[in-house]
Amino acid sequence: MSAYIRDAVRTVRGKARPDGGLAALRPHELIGTLVEALDQRTDGAAHRAGGLILGTVGQVGAQGANVALVSKLHAGLPEDGFAFSLNNCCASGLTAVGQASRMVQTGGPDILAGGVEMMSRVRFMADRADYYADASFPPRTRYIPVALAADRLAEDLGVTRVELDAAALTSQQRTAAAEGTPLVASRIPVNGLDREEPARASTSAESLAALEPAFAALSDPYAEALEGRRIDHRHTVGHAPPM
Protein backbone atom coordinates (compact mmCIF):
# COMPACT_ATOMS: atom_id res chain seq x y z
CA MET A 1 0.00 0.00 0.00
CA SER A 2 1.24 3.50 -0.83
CA ALA A 3 1.21 6.53 1.48
CA TYR A 4 0.46 10.06 0.28
CA ILE A 5 0.60 13.51 1.85
CA ARG A 6 -2.84 15.05 1.38
CA ASP A 7 -1.97 18.52 2.70
CA ALA A 8 0.57 20.26 4.91
CA VAL A 9 0.32 23.35 7.09
CA ARG A 10 2.46 25.09 9.67
CA THR A 11 2.14 28.05 11.97
CA VAL A 12 3.96 31.28 11.34
CA ARG A 13 7.24 31.34 13.30
CA GLY A 14 7.46 33.47 16.42
CA LYS A 15 10.51 34.54 18.40
CA ALA A 16 11.57 32.19 21.20
CA ARG A 17 11.28 34.64 24.06
CA PRO A 18 8.61 35.69 26.58
CA ASP A 19 7.43 38.59 24.41
CA GLY A 20 7.42 36.59 21.17
CA GLY A 21 4.35 36.70 18.98
CA LEU A 22 3.23 33.18 19.94
CA ALA A 23 4.50 33.03 23.53
CA ALA A 24 1.07 33.62 25.08
CA LEU A 25 -0.19 30.37 23.59
CA ARG A 26 0.59 26.76 24.48
CA PRO A 27 1.89 24.00 22.19
CA HIS A 28 -1.42 22.14 22.07
CA GLU A 29 -3.16 25.36 21.07
CA LEU A 30 -0.84 25.74 18.08
CA ILE A 31 -1.58 22.16 17.04
CA GLY A 32 -5.30 22.82 17.46
CA THR A 33 -5.04 25.80 15.12
CA LEU A 34 -3.37 23.63 12.50
CA VAL A 35 -5.96 20.86 12.83
CA GLU A 36 -8.70 23.44 12.27
CA ALA A 37 -6.86 24.82 9.23
CA LEU A 38 -6.46 21.33 7.78
CA ASP A 39 -10.16 20.66 8.27
CA GLN A 40 -11.01 23.82 6.33
CA ARG A 41 -8.63 22.87 3.50
CA THR A 42 -9.65 19.19 3.27
CA ASP A 43 -13.40 19.17 3.95
CA GLY A 44 -13.00 17.90 7.50
CA ALA A 45 -10.44 15.17 6.77
CA ALA A 46 -8.33 16.03 9.83
CA HIS A 47 -11.12 14.94 12.16
CA ARG A 48 -11.43 11.66 10.29
CA ALA A 49 -7.79 10.73 10.89
CA GLY A 50 -7.10 7.68 13.01
CA GLY A 51 -4.18 9.07 14.95
CA LEU A 52 -1.77 11.90 15.72
CA ILE A 53 2.03 11.63 15.94
CA LEU A 54 4.10 14.62 17.08
CA GLY A 55 7.87 14.95 17.22
CA THR A 56 8.98 17.03 20.21
CA VAL A 57 12.44 17.39 21.75
CA GLY A 58 11.65 19.19 25.01
CA GLN A 59 9.10 16.80 26.50
CA VAL A 60 8.75 18.63 29.82
CA GLY A 61 6.53 21.41 31.15
CA ALA A 62 4.12 22.66 28.49
CA GLN A 63 5.33 19.91 26.15
CA GLY A 64 5.34 17.09 28.70
CA ALA A 65 2.85 14.29 29.45
CA ASN A 66 2.57 13.27 25.79
CA VAL A 67 1.87 16.59 24.06
CA ALA A 68 0.31 14.68 21.16
CA LEU A 69 -2.38 13.31 23.47
CA VAL A 70 -3.00 16.74 24.99
CA SER A 71 -3.25 18.19 21.47
CA LYS A 72 -5.65 15.45 20.39
CA LEU A 73 -7.96 16.17 23.32
CA HIS A 74 -7.74 19.94 22.79
CA ALA A 75 -8.50 19.67 19.06
CA GLY A 76 -11.42 17.30 19.63
CA LEU A 77 -9.98 14.56 17.43
CA PRO A 78 -11.73 11.15 17.47
CA GLU A 79 -11.66 9.49 20.88
CA ASP A 80 -10.74 6.11 19.43
CA GLY A 81 -7.70 7.50 17.63
CA PHE A 82 -4.18 7.04 19.00
CA ALA A 83 -1.78 9.84 19.91
CA PHE A 84 1.90 9.61 20.79
CA SER A 85 4.98 11.81 20.92
CA LEU A 86 8.53 10.91 19.93
CA ASN A 87 11.96 12.47 20.30
CA ASN A 88 14.65 12.19 17.65
CA CYS A 89 16.26 15.52 18.46
CA CYS A 90 16.16 18.04 15.59
CA ALA A 91 14.71 15.42 13.21
CA SER A 92 11.71 14.70 15.46
CA GLY A 93 9.04 16.17 13.19
CA LEU A 94 10.44 14.45 10.10
CA THR A 95 10.65 11.19 12.02
CA ALA A 96 7.00 11.53 13.02
CA VAL A 97 5.99 11.94 9.38
CA GLY A 98 8.14 8.96 8.39
CA GLN A 99 6.59 6.81 11.11
CA ALA A 100 3.10 7.80 9.98
CA SER A 101 3.98 6.89 6.40
CA ARG A 102 5.18 3.44 7.42
CA MET A 103 2.02 2.83 9.45
CA VAL A 104 -0.19 3.81 6.51
CA GLN A 105 1.81 1.59 4.15
CA THR A 106 1.20 -1.41 6.41
CA GLY A 107 -2.56 -0.92 6.44
CA GLY A 108 -3.00 1.72 9.12
CA PRO A 109 -5.51 4.59 9.04
CA ASP A 110 -4.99 8.13 7.81
CA ILE A 111 -2.68 9.88 10.28
CA LEU A 112 -1.89 13.46 11.26
CA ALA A 113 1.86 13.87 11.80
CA GLY A 114 4.34 16.67 12.39
CA GLY A 115 6.22 18.40 15.15
CA VAL A 116 5.92 21.10 17.77
CA GLU A 117 8.60 22.99 19.67
CA MET A 118 7.85 26.18 21.63
CA MET A 119 11.16 27.50 22.92
CA SER A 120 9.40 30.50 24.40
CA ARG A 121 7.75 27.97 26.74
CA VAL A 122 10.30 25.15 26.96
CA ARG A 123 13.91 26.23 26.75
CA PHE A 124 16.68 24.36 24.94
CA MET A 125 17.91 21.35 26.98
CA ALA A 126 15.05 21.87 29.45
CA ASP A 127 14.91 18.14 30.20
CA ARG A 128 18.36 18.44 31.86
CA ALA A 129 19.39 15.00 30.64
CA ASP A 130 22.50 13.44 32.19
CA TYR A 131 23.85 13.07 28.66
CA TYR A 132 24.38 16.82 28.38
CA ALA A 133 26.85 17.20 31.24
CA ASP A 134 27.57 13.94 33.12
CA ALA A 135 31.37 13.55 33.25
CA SER A 136 31.05 9.81 33.87
CA PHE A 137 30.10 9.24 30.23
CA PRO A 138 33.07 8.05 28.10
CA PRO A 139 34.43 10.96 26.01
CA ARG A 140 33.27 9.50 22.69
CA THR A 141 29.67 9.29 23.92
CA ARG A 142 29.56 12.79 25.40
CA TYR A 143 27.20 15.49 24.25
CA ILE A 144 28.73 18.23 22.10
CA PRO A 145 26.63 21.40 21.61
CA VAL A 146 25.23 21.72 18.11
CA ALA A 147 27.06 25.01 17.50
CA LEU A 148 30.38 23.47 18.52
CA ALA A 149 29.71 20.40 16.37
CA ALA A 150 28.93 22.71 13.44
CA ASP A 151 32.28 24.46 13.85
CA ARG A 152 34.06 21.11 13.95
CA LEU A 153 32.19 19.86 10.89
CA ALA A 154 32.92 23.05 8.93
CA GLU A 155 36.62 22.62 9.69
CA ASP A 156 36.58 18.92 8.73
CA LEU A 157 34.79 19.60 5.43
CA GLY A 158 36.72 22.75 4.57
CA VAL A 159 33.68 25.06 4.62
CA THR A 160 35.06 28.59 4.80
CA ARG A 161 33.71 31.59 6.67
CA VAL A 162 32.96 33.25 3.32
CA GLU A 163 30.86 30.25 2.27
CA LEU A 164 29.00 30.26 5.59
CA ASP A 165 28.20 33.96 5.19
CA ALA A 166 26.99 33.38 1.63
CA ALA A 167 24.68 30.55 2.71
CA ALA A 168 23.22 32.64 5.55
CA LEU A 169 22.62 35.62 3.26
CA THR A 170 20.93 33.43 0.64
CA SER A 171 18.66 31.96 3.31
CA GLN A 172 17.56 35.39 4.52
CA GLN A 173 17.03 36.62 0.97
CA ARG A 174 14.90 33.60 0.09
CA THR A 175 12.82 34.10 3.22
CA ALA A 176 12.13 37.72 2.28
CA ALA A 177 11.41 36.86 -1.36
CA ALA A 178 8.90 34.17 -0.39
CA GLU A 179 6.52 36.64 1.26
CA GLY A 180 3.35 37.09 -0.74
CA THR A 181 4.01 34.08 -2.98
CA PRO A 182 2.57 30.53 -3.10
CA LEU A 183 5.70 29.38 -1.25
CA VAL A 184 4.03 30.42 2.02
CA ALA A 185 0.57 29.06 1.17
CA SER A 186 0.97 26.40 3.87
CA ARG A 187 1.64 29.00 6.57
CA ILE A 188 -1.19 29.71 8.99
CA PRO A 189 -1.34 33.11 10.79
CA VAL A 190 -1.71 32.79 14.55
CA ASN A 191 -2.53 35.30 17.27
CA GLY A 192 -2.33 38.23 14.84
CA LEU A 193 1.13 37.20 13.62
CA ASP A 194 1.23 36.64 9.85
CA ARG A 195 4.96 36.86 9.03
CA GLU A 196 8.11 35.09 10.19
CA GLU A 197 8.98 37.05 13.31
CA PRO A 198 12.64 35.92 13.56
CA ALA A 199 13.47 36.74 9.90
CA ARG A 200 16.22 39.32 9.38
CA ALA A 201 15.44 41.02 6.08
CA SER A 202 18.11 43.68 6.63
CA THR A 203 20.91 41.10 6.60
CA SER A 204 23.73 41.98 4.20
CA ALA A 205 27.09 40.52 3.25
CA GLU A 206 28.72 43.39 5.13
CA SER A 207 26.75 42.88 8.34
CA LEU A 208 27.53 39.15 8.31
CA ALA A 209 31.24 39.72 7.67
CA ALA A 210 31.43 42.08 10.66
CA LEU A 211 30.30 39.41 13.15
CA GLU A 212 32.80 37.54 15.30
CA PRO A 213 32.73 33.74 15.79
CA ALA A 214 30.23 33.20 18.57
CA PHE A 215 30.91 29.79 20.07
CA ALA A 216 34.59 29.65 21.01
CA ALA A 217 33.71 29.85 24.71
CA LEU A 218 32.13 26.40 24.47
CA SER A 219 35.44 24.66 23.74
CA ASP A 220 36.81 24.60 27.28
CA PRO A 221 33.68 23.22 29.03
CA TYR A 222 33.52 20.43 26.45
CA ALA A 223 37.26 19.81 26.12
CA GLU A 224 36.98 16.17 27.23
CA ALA A 225 34.22 15.42 24.75
CA LEU A 226 36.41 16.96 22.05
CA GLU A 227 39.29 14.77 23.27
CA GLY A 228 41.63 17.74 23.44
CA ARG A 229 41.02 18.91 19.88
CA ARG A 230 41.26 22.64 19.24
CA ILE A 231 38.73 23.93 16.75
CA ASP A 232 38.88 26.80 14.28
CA HIS A 233 35.63 28.53 15.20
CA ARG A 234 33.80 29.93 12.18
CA HIS A 235 30.08 30.19 12.92
CA THR A 236 28.56 33.46 14.12
CA VAL A 237 25.09 34.37 15.36
CA GLY A 238 24.39 35.33 11.74
CA HIS A 239 24.67 31.68 10.74
CA ALA A 240 22.60 30.35 13.64
CA PRO A 241 18.83 29.76 13.55
CA PRO A 242 17.16 33.04 14.54
CA MET A 243 15.26 32.64 17.78
Name the predicted role of every residue range.
Residues 1-75, 79-85, 90, 152-161, ...:
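Conserved active-site "lid/cap" helical segment
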Residues 3-6, 109-113, 243:
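Short glycine-aspartate micro-motif
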Residues 9-12, 23-24, 29-33, 166-243:
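N-terminal extracellular/periplasmic Venus flytrap/periplasmic-binding protein-like
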Residues 11-18, 101-157:
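Glycine-rich loop/linker segments at domain edges
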Residues 25, 56-109, 127-128, 141-148, ...:
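Conserved catalytic cysteine-centered active-site region
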Residues 63-64, 122-124, 193:
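Short glycine-/acidic-enriched loop or helix-start segments at secondary-structure transitions
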Residues 87-116, 154-183:
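Active-site-proximal alpha-helical scaffold in enzymes
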